[in-house]
């Protein structure tokens, strides 16, 4: 009795090993697409091969042709009255787990199979979790017809869902590839906005594009691959270009399209245009001492980082004369934080190392008067500030930093407990008497981007609110903070004009990628302007 049972088990195992067949009974059809035989100038090609009719299958057919298919469920493949024609039959395979299958196409004489747009060699399918598009391209001849039967063999057919249509799963490819928003910036007069997009293709290659749109109408008025930014006044944008005569700076008026040459032969270094558009502040690099090839030398731990020994200094480039003069000199780097609205003062920061105690890096803020070339200290040797900007009248400075910054004036924890160094808060410092006013001492969320609005004298900022980046408005006159309701969970970037009541911002939600909006700062209502991945996710 044991032998028959063992034999039956072996038979069952062989059946399971062979897998089960899933017939594809409904297909999407597009065609026919007539193709012609090429003109024969020679009997063989450069590889001494004669022409083969099957090579017509290598004719490129755009995937866009599959957008309006017909439903086909017959046993005989559609033909054509043309001598030769190409036809496309397609279906989808959806699998939520990794799966393997064998694709069988019977009856057709000349055909190729494409999986997600790539030609399949052989008939073995290795399917990652996704909705896959299978396309059979076949060649028909006049007066001849082929039968057609398509099926899948799989050991786990329950993992495969065969169908037609355009609906598909959201997969990792949708996260890694496609178009995203990098930044947005509204013009000083509030009429236009520049939005930077980056598009990532399969394989990792990417490209940037900059679109200028009309804020009121919402339509795109210009597009370029040049990295463009707004001039400090009006609605002109600028960009640089390298020529035989050096690096040149152009400005373009969005409304008229007029392009003006602002400067020629400017240094090939980072720069900031002054608010009155009369000069550039150049950040120049001074190379540090080189390490001896015979000695492996590390001055301090950070010396292991490339470029640590280099220093950054500031210089002023006069756009009228083309003369560049140094603004700062010294052993430690100096960086630009802001320029006053009247272009007469610079807010700069410098840092130095102190490895003997915490914090190990100390930062100082200074106001430089460009007329007298004198400096006024605002903050000295603080290890916890991270950024600073002038107020519009340049009498005060808005500083961001942890609760330990500025002698702990923003600290609200019990004695003996150390605040988080990444808990960013905001402070106002009077330049004359250096009096510090903490603005967000009792505000819990960690502040991210912040902008002082010259239009209504409010501070708009984003903050890390639990698992969201929320948008807020702070009234510096009374300290009131209002959370602005927006339709996205993560507000990734904001921009405000010098005049007007429109804010440009972009963000994403739990179920969608980046979207671009404009917000009325009086009504606090947001209007959707662009959803760059909407078509991709259809």
Annotate each predicted stretch with a short phrase.
Residues 217-247, 264-270:
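Blade-loop segments of beta-propeller domains
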Residues 178, 197-209, 240-250, 263-269, ...:
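A flexible loop/linker signature enriched in serine peptidases of the S9 family
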Residues 20-75, 133-172:
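Accessory carbohydrate-binding/adhesion or oligomerization-edge regions at the termini
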Residues 128, 184-192, 228-237, 271-279, ...:
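Blade-terminus and WD-like Trp-Asp/Gly-His loop motifs, strongest in beta-propeller folds
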